[in-house]
Amino acid sequence: MSEQNHPQTEPQLDENQIIALRREKLNNIRQQRNAYPNDFKRDSFAADLQAQYGEIGKEELDPQAVPVKIAGRMMLKRQMGKASFATIQDVTGQIQLYLNNKGVSQEVLDDFNHWDLGDIVGAEGTLFKTNHGELTVRVSDIRLLSKSLRPLPDKHKGLSDQETKYRQRYVDLIANEESRNTFIKRSQIIQSVRNFMVGEHYLEVETPMMHPIPGGATAKPFVTHHNALDIPLYLRIAPELYLKRLVVGGLERVFEINRSFRNEGMSVRHNPEFTMIEFYEAFSDYERMMQMAEDIIRNASRTVNGTANITYNGKEVDLESPFERLTILEAIKKYNPHYTDEQLNDAEWLKKEIVKHGESLPPSPGIGSLQLALFEGCAEGKLWNPTFIVDYPVEVSPLARASDTKQGLTERFELFVVGRELANGYSELNDPEDQAERFKSQVAQKDAGDDEAMHYDADYIRAMEFGLPPTGGCGIGIDRLVMLLTDLQTIRDVILFPQMRPE
């Protein structure tokens, strides 16, 4: 395609005028034939053709006259004398079409010249190379399969407005190859995680999305109402308690990749509905869960990036080396070596320091809660390379098993990478009497004004009374994992349709 030939453009009309003009074209088509035919059968994809024939020379390819049927959206269109060129885009990539009055009838050529960018077409022909070496389909027949009534974004500027990208993701996917690649990678990451779990002999399961009692995490739920039963229901904030019921039932290794919902604020790291994997393994503990989380993340990075040493926001992240492990206090002192043990166990000093770092005071007044709040304010954001923070206080870990050797602490971890939480796991509490007491403590906190404290789940206690084996469990945020592995800074860029305020 010669560079001095300029693409055809519609008249300089505003969007409403363009839509009206295109509707008129559609009405003309309707009068002549079916405007939305569904009998074109393609046999080729653009990327497959480029891979198979792109490196073959013109002299070798042209005599083969390889027949193809290809379909896609018209992204470029140029006229050169009596010939026309177009570029169409399918899910795999782009390929050029060439039409002239030797290959197609003048009637077909005239029809084609009235089609617009964005129209979806099906073309049949043979492959050849242009003088510039571009793989091209010499068209023998072409059909309009679906008329685009709205103009595409300018091909040079693309779709640059962020809010429009999120609200009209369908346009973003058409116009921006980077966005398409992000969501292809997202799918590959999820498939990588799923394959890894199956390889570890885990069973994939599905548990309820609507719960009679919200549980499995400390968060505010969305509330709905079941009309037939006349009861309130809650969109799940986590699948944990149902998955552990399955472990009680003898399904010793289970996992679920699905949505959870939390009725809380939105930010670059938070969307009200989000995807996570949770997995549970009988006769296991938090040490095994840390290794599982590490292996899952490292394997996913290798799958989509070819390496576990990646770059995020211009800075290297080492997912290849063993992940560091620190306690909450060790992490605080690593970045604040001037803090003393005496200060870190002084409730009043902790409260002042928490406020100084811009954090809210926790609803629970215990030392452990205060230490955790200080960690979030002064250390969490500095954990760049993957780091497990271990041994969380009992008061902030109502479902985790208490440590046998460390008074007031649990066998719990959270994984932080690039300054944000990516995973949470623990040795599961399997003593039903201890669990019942912790639920009661959570109810007391809720009565005292903590909206995120847990409810008392009597059925879960009943399940535990049948015997929950020693179990390890872990949850990994899929959206944040995709952000990490695609080098994107906001969660909205990795969710196809993020939550938005209505227009």
Swiss-Prot record:
Its ancestry begins with: Bacteria, Pseudomonadati, Pseudomonadota, Betaproteobacteria, Neisseriales
Q: Does the keyword Nucleotide-binding apply?
A: yes
Q: E.C. number, please?
A: 6.1.1.6
Write down how the cofactor binds this protein. Answer: Binds 3 Mg(2+) ions per subunit.
The cofactors named for this UniProt entry are: Mg(2+)
Molecular functions (GO terms)? ATP binding; lysine-tRNA ligase activity; magnesium ion binding; tRNA binding
Keyword vocabulary terms for this entry: Aminoacyl-tRNA synthetase, ATP-binding, Cytoplasm, Ligase, Magnesium, Metal-binding, Nucleotide-binding, Protein biosynthesis
Chief localization class? cytoplasm
Q: Which residues bind Mg(2+) 2?
A: E421
Alphabetical list of InterPro entries matching this protein: Aa-tRNA-synt_II (IPR004364), aa-tRNA-synth_II (IPR006195), aa-tRNA-synth_II/BPL/LPL (IPR045864), Lys-tRNA-ligase_II (IPR002313), Lys-tRNA-ligase_II_N (IPR044136), Lys-tRNA-synth_II_C (IPR018149), NA-bd_OB-fold (IPR012340), NA-bd_OB_tRNA (IPR004365)
- Output the SUPFAM superfamilies linked to this UniProt entry: Class II aaRS and biotin synthetases (SSF55681), Nucleic acid-binding proteins (SSF50249)
Q: Which family does it belong to?
A: Belongs to the class-II aminoacyl-tRNA synthetase family.
For this entry, the protein name equals: Lysine--tRNA ligase
An annotated GO cellular component: cytosol
